[in-house]
């Protein structure tokens, strides 16, 4: 146990080479929080008696009840290394005490925006994988997110006790399971890896994979055992590590190493990993769980484990826990792996600077980030808001990338839409206090240098969810985070008692602050809408809203899915609209954009802020666009970054650039509320073919052009086979064989289509993957559990948009019925308008 004073931590913060910022990421229920507990216990923040069941990181009541992590929380740990260990660190270090900032993030798919926020402020990730279940859909998603942020992973294979106690595997089987898991992690890493990072695949023989049991509180790496044996046999430790994994065998008769699994007489030899590492563990388990009273003391003496007075009377699982914790304490193995193999901020910011900073990569601010310089101008990124213990206020939670942040310092608070030299989305305020985040509590601290994670008090009124804090007006923003999920399920919320309305409005503001991936807005008909990523996410948001943020009883409508409007063909004729004063005309055609281009826009590969030549290059080389068109993209819409484009195909039009702003504004408006039923548009490209403008500037102002452009966009879309797209979930279900029939029947009932079904080798479990329209997903979990007797556990994650087949104008078709219902609910005429409503004759 380490007794912390704030001064000691503050001292460690200055040695940035000895800081490690890391997050724990994994699939739901693979045991992140339990592992984090054993780390926290080592750093001396909770008492040893409670670890394992304390779930210290789960700070919220509902997290402890549901047994899942919802928000990500941060904690500082202290690790001290022996001089021998420090020698093995491949980067610059200073002394042998280390500060580890640990962020535990949720594994449940619906909360993956929380994971993104946690990843942005860290440099390394501890990826937890369940021995029995292996790599699942969410493991892959979070690992992909981490590699996209240029974060270096190390792996923990958790729940080894399950394999030993539940499945009773043999040593060789267990080795094969481990090897398979490591392999599948490396496949994902090599697929998504950024060349700048170099090879970040994980290898047990290099010490970047640990094997653990979070519940029992023990863990080991190959390196630890190599340490023990190299001292015992006087062999070189590095050589020993290589031999303790893979196909190497020790022949006890000849005392020689070999890579063949049989000796000279053809007798099978035992793999070194099994013989030297698994054997002592298996023996302990066998002796203790079979209550062999006489064997236990002999084994303990051999392994140099001493039991205290009352521990000698324990037996069974309780004794097993105590012994394994003494033999292989989890925190030692994990902290050693974190300190040895994860980068310090100094190392990481050299290659992460360009992905973090929006401005030019050679300006002084990017250079300061690259050098992690505590004396430069302040660059701090706030990744999310954390509610304080007194209701209604938030800590801004973020990381200092350059400079030093102090209490009472005057700073510039730049929201996500801020641009250098402009005034919007910018506040000049001073920071009231800087605090250290410690899980459930916070500690006040005077200042915090570059490379560390910090909480700020007093700026929550000026930031919505995330933003950049600097002290220099020339500094650009840090790049906005990319969320891998989008809010597609929405409900309308109203108060039961009309007097409570102001509280609801205030509560909605707070809710959207505290969760990075929730959308709250007011619809045209005056309803308050809350949109989330899935059923569970929405349920928790609404529960938060009712109990904490608004604190008033609410009425909640049944959930509705958001759709997208699109076109499937090119406009059948050129659409034309005239301005209200009849002096200006715009001629356009609409056509669909390929799904791949839309995805690239949504994932930020094709970016509206990029240089137009670079953007044209990608479009021409990767997607086969005409270069001239690709250079003349006027804007992306809606919100300036959506997957719809205006392309200027006009030839020699006078005054054209004067109306560009009006056209862009109109297009944003038209794509935000499409012609079919007022939803966002997606994958629509509008080509401006010709424009006739009045010679007098006064007759072609915004008031003339904007409505015209909006009408002509609508007309061209209605002429181009309009259709709607619905969101589709990717479902992953793990279940035993006898439950598969039930799964198929539920999926068929809900328009689902199965894409793969495979058995996990070495287990009786099957993994079924399927596409399920979000529209049909409500109550899916419940029905699935009924049909399979509670054996199937689904994971839903938003995957893609898919066009609904059928005519939108025919109310008897499936999409037509959806359109009609939505139009009636929004108070529009039930029929989809004809194109003639927006089309003007010459």
Swiss-Prot record:
CDD domains: aeEF2_snRNP_like_IV, eEF2_snRNP_like_C, EF2, EF2_snRNP_III, EF2_snRNP_like_II. It comes from the Eukaryota. One of its GO terms (molecular function) is ribosome binding. Gene3D superfamilies: 3.30.230.10, 3.30.70.240, Elongation Factor G (Translational Gtpase), domain 3, P-loop containing nucleotide triphosphate hydrolases, Translation factors. Its EC number is 3.6.5.-. It is an enzyme of class 3 (hydrolase). GO terms for cellular component: cytosol; ribonucleoprotein complex. Its main location: cytoplasm. PROSITE patterns: G_TR_1 (PS00301), G_TR_2 (PS51722). Pfam families: EFG_C, EFG_III, EFG_IV, GTP_EFTU, GTP_EFTU_D2. It is found in: Cytoplasm. It catalyses: GTP + H2O = GDP + phosphate + H(+). Keywords: Cytoplasm, Elongation factor, GTP-binding, Hydrolase, Nucleotide-binding, Protein biosynthesis. Residues 17-346 form the tr-type G domain. GTP binds at residues 26-33, 158-161, 213-215. The modification Diphthamide is found at residue 699. The keyword Protein biosynthesis applies. Catalyzes the GTP-dependent ribosomal translocation step during translation elongation. During this step, the ribosome changes from the pre-translocational (PRE) to the post-translocational (POST) state as the newly formed A-site-bound peptidyl-tRNA and P-site-bound deacylated tRNA move to the P and E sites, respectively. Catalyzes the coordinated movement of the two tRNA molecules, the mRNA and conformational changes in the ribosome. Belongs to the TRAFAC class translation factor GTPase superfamily. Classic translation factor GTPase family. EF-G/EF-2 subfamily. Has antigenic properties. This is Elongation factor 2. It comes from Candida albicans (strain WO-1). The gene is EFT2.
């Amino acid at each position: 146990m380490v007794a912390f004073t704030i001064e000691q931590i503050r001292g460690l913060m200055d040695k940035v080479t000895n800081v490690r910022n890391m997050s724990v990421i994994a699939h739901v229920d693979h045991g992140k929080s339990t592992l984090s507990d054993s780390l926290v216990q080592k750093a001396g923040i909770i008492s040893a008696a409670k670890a394992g069941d304390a779930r210290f990181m789960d700070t919220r009541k509902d997290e402890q009840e549901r047994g899942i992590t919802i928000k990500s929380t941060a904690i500082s740990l202290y690790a001290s290394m022996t001089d021998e260990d420090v020698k093995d660190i491949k980067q610059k270090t200073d002394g042998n005490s280390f500060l580890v900032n640990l962020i535990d993030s949720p594994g449940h798919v619906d909360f993956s925006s929380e994971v993104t926020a946690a990843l942005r402020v860290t440099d390394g990730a501890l990826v937890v994988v369940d021995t029995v279940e292996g790599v699942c859909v969410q493991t892959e998603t979070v690992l992909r997110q981490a590699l996209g942020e240029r974060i270096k992973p190390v792996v923990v294979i958790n729940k080894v006790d399950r394999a030993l106690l539940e499945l009773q595997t043999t040593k060789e089987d267990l080795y094969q399971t481990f090897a398979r898991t490591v392999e599948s992690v490396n496949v994902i890493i090599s697929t998504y890896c950024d060349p700048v990072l170099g090879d970040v695949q994980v290898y047990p023989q290099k010490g970047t994979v640990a094997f653990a049991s979070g519940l029992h509180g023990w863990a080991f790496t190959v390196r630890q055992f190599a340490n023990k044996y190299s001292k015992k046999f006087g062999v070189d430790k590095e050589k020993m590590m290589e031999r303790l994994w893979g196909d190497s065998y020790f022949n006890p008769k000849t005392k020689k190493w070999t890579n063949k699994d049989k000796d000279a007489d053809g007798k099978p030899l035992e793999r070194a990993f099994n013989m030297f590492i698994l054997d002592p563990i298996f023996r302990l388990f066998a002796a203790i769980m079979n209550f062999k009273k006489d064997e236990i003391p002999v084994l303990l003496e051999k392994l140099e484990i001493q039991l205290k007075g009352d521990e000698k009377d324990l037996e069974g699982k309780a004794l097993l826990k105590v012994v394994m914790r003494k033999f292989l304490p989890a925190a030692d193995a994990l902290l050693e792996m974190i300190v040895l193999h994860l980068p310090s901020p100094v190392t990481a910011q050299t290659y992460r600077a360009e992905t973090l900073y929006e401005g030019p990569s050679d300006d002084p601010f990017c250079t300061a980030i690259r050098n992690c310089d505590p004396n430069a101008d302040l660059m701090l990124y706030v990744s999310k808001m954390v509610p304080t213990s007194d209701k209604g206020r938030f800590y801004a939670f973020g990381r200092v990338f350059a400079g030093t942040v102090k209490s009472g310092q005057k700073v510039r608070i730049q929201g996500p839409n801020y641009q250098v030299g402009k005034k919007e989305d910018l506040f000049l305020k001073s920071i009231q206090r800087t605090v250290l985040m410690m899980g459930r509590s916070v500690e006040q601290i005077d200042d915090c240098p570059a490379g560390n994670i910090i909480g700020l008090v007093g700026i929550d009124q000026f930031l919505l969810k995330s933003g950049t804090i600097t002290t220099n007006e020339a500094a650009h923003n840090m790049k906005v985070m990319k969320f891998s999920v989008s809010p597609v399920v929405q409900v309308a919320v109203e108060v039961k008692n009309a007097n409570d309305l102001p509280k609801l409005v205030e509560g909605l503001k707070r809710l959207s602050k505290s969760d990075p991936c929730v959308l709250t807005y007011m619809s045209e008909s005056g309803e308050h809408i809350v949109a989330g990523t899935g059923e569970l996410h929405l349920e928790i948001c609404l529960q938060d809203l009712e109990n904490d943020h608004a604190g008033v009883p609410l009425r909640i409508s049944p959930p509705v899915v958001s759709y997208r409007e699109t076109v499937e063909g090119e406009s059948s004729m050129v659409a034309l609209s005239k301005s209200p004063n009849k002096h200006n005309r715009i001629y356009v055609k609409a056509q669909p954009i390929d799904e791949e281009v839309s995805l690239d826009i949504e994932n930020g590969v094709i970016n509206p802020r990029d240089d137009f030549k670079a953007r044209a290059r990608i479009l021409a080389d990767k997607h086969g666009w005409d270069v001239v068109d690709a250079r003349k993209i006027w804007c992306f819409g809606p919100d300036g970054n959506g997957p719809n484009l205006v392309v200027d195909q006009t030839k020699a039009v006078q005054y054209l650039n004067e109306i560009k702003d009006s056209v862009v504004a109109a297009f944003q408006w038209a794509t935000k509320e499409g012609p079919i039923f007022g939803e966002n548009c997606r994958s629509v490209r509008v080509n401006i073919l010709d424009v006739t403008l009045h010679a007098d500037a006064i007759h072609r102002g915004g008031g003339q052009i904007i409505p015209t452009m909006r009408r002509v966009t609508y007309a061209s879309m209605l002429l181009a086979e309009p259709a709607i797209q619905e969101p589709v979930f990717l479902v992953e279900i793990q279940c035993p064989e006898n439950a598969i029939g039930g799964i198929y029947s539920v999926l068929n009932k809900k328009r689902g289509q199965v894409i793969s079904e495979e058995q996990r080798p070495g287990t009786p479990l099957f993994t079924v993957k399927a596409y399920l329209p979000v529209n049909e997903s409500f109550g899916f979990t419940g029905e699935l559990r009924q049909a399979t007797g509670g054996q199937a556990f689904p994971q839903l994650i938003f995957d893609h948009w898919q066009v609904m087949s059928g005519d939108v104008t025919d109310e008897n078709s499936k999409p037509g019925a959806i359109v009609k219902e939505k139009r009636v609910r929004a108070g529009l005429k039930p029929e989809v308008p004809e194109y003639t409503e927006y089309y003007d004759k010459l």
